[in-house]
Amino acid sequence: MIHLAREIAKAKIYPAVDLRTSRSRLIETGAVAEEHRVVAEQVRRVLAAALWNVGDPPEAAADRRMVERARKLQNYFTQPFFVAEPYTHRPGTYVRRDEALHTCRDILEGRYDDIPVKAFYFAGGIEEIRNRAAAVQ
């Protein structure tokens, strides 16, 4: 069940899927691999803790890292989908599910801590993200 949110669209996050209220029957019924379920739960937990329940800015370095990783995940989910072309004016790209899963896991584990958050915005796969980061530096 996918829920779209106007406030997410106003932030120019497309597709404007609200991960707080959206659910996957495939994950809930165990139709996906265990790794997929675990990574999806970790992503949801990090996004909820770092972006949706934020009160004061994080003080500890670990908290700041978690918020930055959550922002990278949020931006990574703005992959240039074909259905979003009318809104983003960017051509759609295809990212394989296993690549998306591994990239999410690697973001959570800090493997891309050296890549700026903005490099993940409307990027396709991790190679495009790395190329953007290299072009900025």
Predicted features and spans:
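Conserved catalytic/coupling modules of large nucleotide/cofactor-utilizing molecular machines
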Residues: M1-Q137
